[in-house]
């Protein structure tokens, strides 16, 4: 069901790699809610080609950009405004990558070049997007920027390694830039801390199935799906959340507020 929440709005959606991507679902939802937007991803991700199907479904243009390259982000914001015919109302940052995780490196055996790369791709890229947008004055008054995070920013999860610091940094950038951009142009900046979700980035983490199931049994509402995340993100892009900014918003079925659930207790009692 469409509510027309984003009628007349222009956006930029990053990170749609394939149908499982959270950004893919956000794009479909934003389209359904009446938005027009451009799609972007790292040039290397384009080779897989799936994004073209999404672009067709949404009537969107694809503008490749490596989110760590300021020059490419300048092109992204400039061309998006040209294609869409005006300033941008919403931006989705849905970007994460850690080579240490991909290569199963333990927290006590991290490669520091990869560590810095993970921070650059997964966190600093949000700052680069915001600073580029501000310098180009590319985001409209009252616009909304959302980045996706994970609760490993607050709590330790052994296999999340350097991405835990990336997410802590991402959330901190959202607060600091949220203050600046809010004062300057009423632009909101928030992070949405999402449940474990079966995507390329998600399932790349070793032990993913176990902690997906653990989170599901801990959360009174169960894990939030990518589609449900898209529903939430769309409200944050809409005019219904005009005074929400500088927040890390949990979208996790209640996981972040639970100490232990009856289900986990029962499971451990059975084992004991
Ligand atoms: N899947 C989960 O369990 C989960 C949970 C909480 C938060 N998140 C976050 O959600 C976001 C989206 O991830 P996803 O789970 O949809 O997985 P995904 O693999 O579908 O998306 C990650 C995207 O990042 C893009 N990317 C990587 N390097 C890039 C670069 N240099 N420039 C531009 N784009 C680049 C990839 O091409 C890909 O499209 C990430 O920030 C992720 O950390 C995921």
Regions found by a protein language model. Give the residues of each.
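Canonical Rossmann dinucleotide-binding motif of NAD(H)/NADP(H)-dependent dehydrogenases/reductases
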Residues: 3-39
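C-terminal helical subdomain
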Residues: 124, 187, 191, 209-244, ...
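Short C-terminal tail/terminal secondary-structure segment
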Residues: 245-272
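Conserved glycine-rich Rossmann-like NAD(P)H-binding loop of the short-chain dehydrogenase/reductase
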Residues: 35-51
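Catalytic loop of short-chain dehydrogenase/reductase
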Residues: 15-25, 96-184, 193-199, 222, ...
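Hydrophobic structural elements of the Rossmann-like NAD(P)H-binding subdomain
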Residues: 13, 92, 146, 189-192, ...
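Aromatic pocket-lining residues of Rossmann-like dinucleotide-binding sites
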Residues: 30, 181, 236
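Conserved mid-core segment of classical short-chain dehydrogenase/reductases
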Residues: 55-57, 63-74, 78-117, 135, ...
């Amino acid at each position: 069901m469409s509510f027309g929440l984003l009628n007349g709005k222009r956006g930029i959606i990053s990170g749609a790699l394939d149908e499982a991507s959270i950004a893919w679902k956000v794009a479909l939802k934003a389209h359904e809610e009446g938005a027009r937007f451009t799609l972007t991803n790292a040039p290397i991700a384009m080779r897989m080609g799936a994004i073209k199907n999404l672009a067709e479904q949404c009537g969107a243009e694809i503008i490749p950009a490596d989110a760590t390259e300021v020059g490419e982000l300048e092109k992204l914001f400039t061309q998006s405004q040209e294609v869409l015919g005006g300033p941008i109302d919403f931006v989705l940052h849905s970007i994460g990558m850690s080579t240490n995780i991909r290569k199963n490196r333990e927290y006590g055996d991290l490669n520091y070049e990869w560590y810095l790369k993970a921070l650059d791709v997964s966190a600093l890229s949000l700052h680069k997007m915001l600073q580029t947008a501000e310098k180009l004055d590319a985001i409209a008054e009252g616009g909304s920027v959302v980045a996706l995070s994970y609760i490993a920013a607050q709590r330790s999860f052994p296999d999340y390694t350097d991405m835990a610091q990336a997410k802590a940094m991402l959330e901190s950038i959202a607060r600091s830039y949220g203050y600046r951009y809010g004062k300057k142009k009423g632009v909101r900046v928030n992070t949405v801390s999402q449940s474990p979700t079966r995507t390329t980035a998600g399932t790349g983490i070793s032990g993913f199935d176990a902690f997906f199931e653990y989170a599901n049994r801990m959360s009174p509402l169960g894990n939030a799906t990518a589609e449900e995340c898209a529903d939430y993100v769309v409200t944050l892009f809409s005019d219904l959340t005009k005074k929400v900014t500088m927040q890390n918003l949990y979208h996790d079925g209640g996981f972040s507020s639970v100490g232990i659930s009856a289900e986990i207790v029962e499971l451990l009692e059975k084992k004991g």
